[in-house]
Structure formats: C-alpha cells, structure tokens
Amino acid sequence: MDMKKLIERINFLYKKSKEEGLTEEEKIEQQKLRREYIDIIKGNVKVQLEGVEKIPTPNRRN
C-alpha cells in the first residue's frame, strides 16, 4: 500500500475509534496497518544506517 494511503487509513481508523468505536474487523485492520507502517519505517531506518560511514576523528592533544 502507498505510504500516504496507509497513513490516511490509520488516521481514519484512529478518529473513528475515538468517535464511535471500531468493529472487530476494523480493530484487526488497524493493528495490521500499524504493523505494516512500523515495518516500513524500520526498513527505511535500517537502509539509512547501512549507508552511514564512520569517519575517524584525528587524535587531538589538549
């Protein structure tokens, strides 16, 4: 699912849960969407961290 649509659906279900409550199916969908979102974010962070190179700092004497 497109990230924008994923976030929109998560937000919709959150607002609905506060206003009128969710059905059991919607609660399950909400959990799955939140897990998918978290997995995407974790994957993005992992890719960014793998691309980071450590730059050695020169020894400094004070």
Curated annotation (Swiss-Prot):
Primary subcellular site in the record, as a coarse category: cytoplasm
* UniProt xrefs under Pfam families: DUF896 (PF05979)
Q: Listed GO cellular component terms?
A: cytoplasm
Q: Where in the cell is it found?
A: Cytoplasm
Which keywords are on file for this protein? Cytoplasm
From the Swiss-Prot or TrEMBL record, give the protein name.
UPF0291 protein CLK_1994
The record's family statement is: Belongs to the UPF0291 family.
User: Could you tell me which HAMAP family the record lists for this protein?
Assistant: UPF0291
Q: Which Gene3D superfamilies match?
A: Helix hairpin bin
